[in-house]
């Protein structure tokens, strides 16, 4: 191995260049002192720290111990060495291994008192760093990681065009095959000759003759890096960076077998006690963190307010021997080893923003990083993948749930319609009868309801209707609640399952009521004040309203599961008339009256109960269905047609054996409707009808229950 004196680099280099030029084309060994300083730094890497001669540094024995591989003998002597040793640089000798061309340095240090070191460093600081000034004069250079074709015996070395034009002498492109001979010297001033040619399709710069000999001599493999450097004098130099050195992370056996007695902590402890000179062998590429730090840099890091949550950036050398900047966040701090209490060596715990490309340590030293900004504590969680996330709408915190204790826990977003298979052709009908693309906003909606987890499993306690979003219920009345039945979906969602594609989802309720001033009123529709007052007067003094009438789902085995029945005996609704409906001119039409028992105008309507209501869907009078007097309707589905309802096969209420006619839309003023296929009423229903009150005081609606073929 060879070494050079930093003070005599330029003179020795010029003398060696004259001698090497006369040796011919064969590689010739160079004498000591012929190593170029710029080439050494280029091989060491862009972030390799190296103090200048006469400078003041801080030596950290803990980092040196890690650099040596944690030798037991060195660990035993660590107790006599302080965690930080202030030193003055006596000499710097740049060395290179003859077998591997790996660079390292021998530093001669003498311990100093902190006060003496501070006075010696006054006026220097960052501007007085001689090594940074030398880097500013770095000549033209390019570095390339070798590929498999670059290391093959029959191939050559492909040089990027811009790099060839910047570092190599210019070619004569007027020739048919431009070429020239290049002469480059390595760290040991050994000359290597290559043929530089510009050829191929497309044309490119290649090093052919002499390249295979260089690869075999240096034992280069794919992944190693080769660099070419042209100085100010035009001389071309050649160096290598081995990728295996960064991966192994261990010291060179030849280096430390010869010099281990000079770099142990035992000698350091003796030198600190006697204030004598000690030598440190330092490989900048092997050390994951600096353990010899300039004094100004060390003191500057101590003045920085490092705390949890601060963001930082750090220069780091990747495997391709290029300098990169990585960012991260500080997650903690503390001593790495209790034996070195108070040591600043890797005292910061960090988390990198992206640690997939290159594995970096989770501990860094304060002088290695640069603070950028601070973040809140909520950003300390594990980072996620940068996938686009849907922007969910804000839910009103006043949108309360009874017995829920806060905002409803929607299983799905409240602002997105859920469409299942076969529902793509359906539209959504808003409260006003027009198609709406989205649900009404939840702001200013004060509703109380029971979500899907609170729905009763007892069919007799299930209520078909849920309120329209436009209606409000006083939050102060806990007895006024809405229950959902069916599939337990949120009432904000329009959901249709497979088989329900032929029917539009409805907005509204069968019994659309709200409570106010001990009376019923419709907030969305105009009404006469006299009628409302009369209605309130009739209810004055009576029991409080406990909820809309319940539509019981039958539990008898004789009743089909798709038939909906009205609850009679268990109904707690006051002032409701119960009676038997009478058949009209069509045997299959039965009617249910809605209305008060006295003093209020009645009006009868036929409202179809759709064969498959789902929870969260409501029924309104202004819907689009088939006219009741369509031609040929009773001829097919009339009472004389015995085949209907007996031999048919249905799934979710849809017949698989008969063709379902298309529906036509009626005007909003037409209130007569009929179902697609009329079926015979089961015996379990009898002639029982329930006259329940509608929310609208002057309107009575008649519901045909004999044709109901409902799905639970």
Swiss-Prot record:
SUPFAM superfamilies: DNA-binding pseudobarrel domain. One of its GO terms (biological process) is auxin-activated signaling pathway. One of its GO terms (molecular function) is DNA binding. It comes from the Eukaryota. InterPro entries: ARF_dom, ARF_plant, B3_DNA-bd, DNA-bd_pseudobarrel_sf. Gene3D superfamilies: 2.30.30.1040, DNA-binding pseudobarrel domain. It is found in: Nucleus. GO terms for cellular component: nucleus. It holds the Pfam family B3. The keyword DNA-binding applies. Residues 142-244 bind DNA. Its main location: nucleus. Keywords: Auxin signaling pathway, DNA-binding, Nucleus, Transcription, Transcription regulation. Expressed in roots, culms, leaves and young panicles. Homo and heterodimers. Auxin response factors (ARFs) are transcriptional factors that bind specifically to the DNA sequence 5'-TGTCTC-3' found in the auxin-responsive promoter elements (AuxREs). Belongs to the ARF family. This is Auxin response factor 15.
């Amino acid at each position: 191995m060879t070494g050079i004196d930093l003070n005599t680099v330029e003179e020795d280099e010029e003398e060696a260049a004259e001698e090497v030029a006369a040796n011919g084309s064969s590689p010739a060994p160079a004498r000591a002192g012929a190593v170029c300083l710029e080439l050494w730094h280029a091989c060491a890497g862009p972030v390799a720290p190296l103090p200048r001669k006469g400078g003041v540094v801080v030596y950290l024995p803990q980092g040196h111990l890690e650099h040596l591989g944690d030798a037991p003998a060195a660990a035993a002597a660590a107790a006599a060495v302080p965690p930080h040793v202030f030193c003055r640089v006596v000499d710097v000798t740049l060395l290179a291994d003859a077998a591997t061309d790996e660079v390292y340095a021998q530093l001669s240090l003498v311990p100093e008192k902190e006060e003496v070191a501070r006075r010696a460093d006054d006026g220097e600081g960052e501007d007085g760093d001689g090594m940074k000034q030398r880097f500013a004069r770095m000549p033209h250079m390019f570095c390339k990681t070798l590929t498999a074709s670059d290391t093959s015996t029959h191939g050559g070395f492909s040089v990027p065009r811009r790099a060839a034009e910047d570092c190599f002498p210019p070619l004569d492109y007027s020739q048919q095959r431009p070429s020239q001979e290049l002469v480059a010297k390595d760290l040991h001033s050994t000359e290597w000759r290559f043929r530089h040619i510009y050829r191929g399709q497309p044309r490119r710069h290649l090093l052919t003759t002499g390249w295979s000999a260089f690869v075999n001599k240096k034992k280069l493999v794919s992944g190693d890096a080769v660099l070419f450097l042209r100085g100010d004098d035009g001389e071309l130099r050649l160096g290598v960076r081995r990728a295996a050195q960064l991966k192994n992370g261990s010291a060179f056996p030849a280096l430390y077998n010869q010099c281990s007695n000079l770099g142990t902590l035992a000698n350091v402890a003796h030198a600190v006690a006697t204030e004598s000179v000690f030598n440190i062998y330092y490989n900048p590429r092997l050390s994951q963190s600096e353990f010899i730090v300039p004094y100004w840099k060390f003191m500057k890091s101590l003045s920085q307010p490092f705390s949890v949550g601060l963001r930082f950036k750090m220069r780091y050398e990747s495997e391709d021997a290029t300098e990169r900047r990585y960012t991260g966040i500080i997650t903690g701090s503390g001593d790495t080893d209790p034996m070195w209490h108070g040591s600043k060596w890797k005292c910061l715990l960090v988390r990198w923003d992206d640690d997939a490309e290159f594995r970096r340590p989770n501990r860094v030293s304060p002088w290695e990083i640069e603070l950028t900004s601070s973040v809140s504590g909520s950003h300390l969680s594990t980072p996620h993948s940068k996938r686009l996330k849907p922007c969910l709408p804000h839910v009103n915190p006043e949108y309360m749930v009874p017995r829920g204790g806060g905002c409803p826990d929607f299983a799905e977003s409240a602002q997105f319609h859920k469409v299942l298979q076969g529902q793509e052709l359906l539209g959504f009908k808003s409260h006003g009868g027009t198609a709406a693309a989205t649900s009404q906003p939840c702001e200013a909606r004060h509703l109380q309801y029971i979500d899907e987890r609170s729905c009763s499993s007892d069919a007799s306690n299930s209520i078909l209707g849920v309120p329209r979003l436009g209606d409000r219920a006083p939050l102060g009345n806990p007895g006024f609640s809405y229950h959902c039945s069916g599939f337990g979906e949120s009432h904000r969602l329009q959901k249709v399952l497979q088989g329900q594609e032929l029917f539009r989802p409805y907005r509204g309720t069968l019994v659309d009521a709200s409570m106010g001033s001990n009376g019923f009123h419709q907030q969305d529709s105009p009404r006469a004040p006299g009628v409302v007052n009369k209605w309130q007067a009739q209810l004055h003094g009576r029991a409080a309203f406990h909820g809309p009438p319940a539509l019981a789902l039958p539990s008898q085995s004789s009743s089909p599961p798709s038939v909906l029945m009205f609850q009679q005996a268990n109904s707690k609704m006051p002032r409701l008339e119960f009676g038997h409906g009478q058949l009209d001119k069509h045997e299959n039409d039965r009617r249910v009256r809605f209305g008060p028992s006295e003093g209020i105008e009645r009006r009868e309507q036929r409202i179809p109960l759709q064969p498959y209501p789902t929870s969260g869907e409501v029924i309104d009078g202004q819907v689009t269905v088939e006219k009741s007097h369509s031609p040929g309707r009773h001829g097919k589905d009339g009472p004389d047609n015995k085949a209907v309802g007996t031999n048919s096969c249905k799934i979710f209420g849809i017949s698989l054996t008969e063709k379902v006619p298309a529906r036509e839309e009626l005007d909003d003023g037409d209130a007569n409707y009929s179902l697609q296929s009329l079926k015979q009423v089961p015996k379990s229903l009898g002639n029982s009808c329930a006259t329940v009150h509608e929310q609208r005081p002057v309107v009575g609606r008649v519901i045909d229950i004999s044709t109901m073929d409902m799905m639970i």
